[in-house]
Amino acid sequence: MMNVIKPRLKQIKKYTLWDKAYISLKSALLAGKYVPGERIILRKVAQDLGISLTPVRDAINRLIAENVLDRGGVGQGGGASVPLLNSWEFNQLMLIRIGLEPIAAEASVKNATKLEVSHIEKYFEQMKVLAKSRNLSAYLDAHYKFHFGIYKLANQEILFQAIEATWLRCGPTLNLALPEYNPGQKRHKHHLAALSALKQGNGKKLAQAIFADIESA
């Protein structure tokens, strides 16, 4: 029996296709589902999403304009590739994360409801299980949802967009390091501290936990 390769992008409905293609590609990049240097082929993305080439091309062109992707070379049919970051570029991005994410974390506590905190706690529990099972790709997805679940609560759209833009460029590099990456107790300690601070409504402790988490990456 032939092995069927599952698409990395979820199929979408037939409306607002340009926006949906853009969001789907961003989600895949944020979750580290592409690695640096990997080609993103228009036809393959369109097939995964169940849409035509035009909205996919437009979405990729926007990501290129935002410096998230590099334009594909001659003969790549309008596709793109994921940039290869050097250590200096990656360190710059991590410094930006350290500067921005604790601000969003501290602001999030005033808007955190019990329901929203329960969702974030669910992602934390998923991270623990996935780390033990070495399902690191799924771990990175849960890790992204944990962090952005917190930052979204700040209700500061410009700050949120700046953090997202940084993660869009970090995600693929983090994915590349997955085979050597083992999220252990030190990282769980920071995530647990962040979750506990969120439950307590302690913004300063939450900011400190997020800072420590990024610094230990």
Listing of model-derived features with the role each one plays in the protein:
Residues M1-E106, K110:
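Short linear motifs at protein or domain termini
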Residues N91-I98, L178, A207, F211:
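Short amphipathic alpha-helical segments with heptad-repeat character
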Residues K114-N175, H190-A193, K205-S216:
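Conserved amphipathic alpha-helical segments that form helical-bundle/coiled-coil interaction surfaces
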Residues T16, R71, V117-S118, N182-K186:
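Short helix-capping and inter-helix turn/linker motifs at the boundaries of alpha-helical repeat units
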Residues A28, G32, R71, T166-T173, ...:
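A short secondary-structure junction motif
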